[in-house]
Design a protein with these regions (language model features):
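Ubiquitin-like/PB1-type beta-grasp interaction modules and other compact soluble beta-rich domains
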Residues: 1-99
Length: 100
């Protein structure tokens, strides 16, 4: 068995490539507006994003309070690891906004 040579920031061509788009505080913590990761669920994609930004503790803290959209559909109270993603999907990362 060999280890994959794909880094967390490089999509794996055998798995769906998902664009993660950050808004407001999430964008500030990530240092970029968007980036692509591989995964078959929103949970896998978010785990890859966390790994890519593991040296920025604030990034994980912001993700912990965010809401998510996949393909313009709210993830809501679903566990992100149960939300399937497909190649070309956009996962929006939305921090809480002032006023609720």
């Amino acid at each position: 068995m060999t280890a994959s040579s794909t880094s967390p920031t490089e999509p794996d061509s055998a798995r769906p490539s998902v664009t993660v788009r950050y808004w407001a505080a999430a964008k500030s913590a990530a240092g970029v507006a968007e980036e692509s990761f591989s995964g078959t669920t929103a949970g896998e994609v978010l785990a890859a994003a966390r790994a890519a930004h593991s040296k920025t503790p604030r990034f994980g803290q912001v993700l912990d309070v965010c809401s998510y959209l996949v393909g313009e559909q709210p993830v809501g109270l679903k566990d992100p690891s149960t939300v399937q993603v497909t190649d070309g999907d956009v996962l929006e990362v939305l921090p809480p906004f002032a006023g609720g």
